Amino acid sequence: MARIAGVDLPREKKVEIGLTYIFGIGRKTAQKILEASGVSSAQRVRDLNDNDLNKLRQEIERNHRVEGALRTEVAMNIKRLMDIGSYRGTRHRRGLPVRGQRTHTNARTKKGPRRAIAGKKKVTK
């Protein structure tokens, strides 16, 4: 089983799709990595030899931030926004949508499930 950047790539998928299982690599980035390392995108992961795997590993380590390092960077960027007290940081801190979406209705994914208000009952007619 091919293991790159701490992720086991699925054996039956093509290399281009298999690389997208690594956090921080999408289809376009996978295409660029394959082109730069000289590995054919038509190959399946199970058909890669050790030389191809090493080329892919080196290309990813040298030129791309993936997995833990990328997650840390994103978390630090959000923490920085909160620390400087920007509007976006405040929205992150309160658990509300950050990019201008409405919150009067909707925004349930970000806000979480509704909470009941104690003592407030619906009036039945």
Swiss-Prot record:
PROSITE patterns given in the database record:
RIBOSOMAL_S13_1, RIBOSOMAL_S13_2
Q: Which InterPro entries match?
A: Rbsml_uS13_C, Ribosomal_uS13, Ribosomal_uS13-like_H2TH, Ribosomal_uS13_bac-type, Ribosomal_uS13_CS
Which keywords, in A-to-Z order, does the entry hold?
A: Ribonucleoprotein, Ribosomal protein, RNA-binding, rRNA-binding, tRNA-binding
Q: Which residues form a coiled coil?
A: none
Name-wise, this protein is: Small ribosomal subunit protein uS13
HAMAP family under this entry?
A: Ribosomal_uS13
Q: Where is this region: Disordered?
A: 90-125
Asked if the keyword RNA-binding belongs to this entry, the reply reads yes
Q: Which organism is it from?
A: Gemmatimonas aurantiaca (strain DSM 14586 / JCM 11422 / NBRC 100505 / T-27)
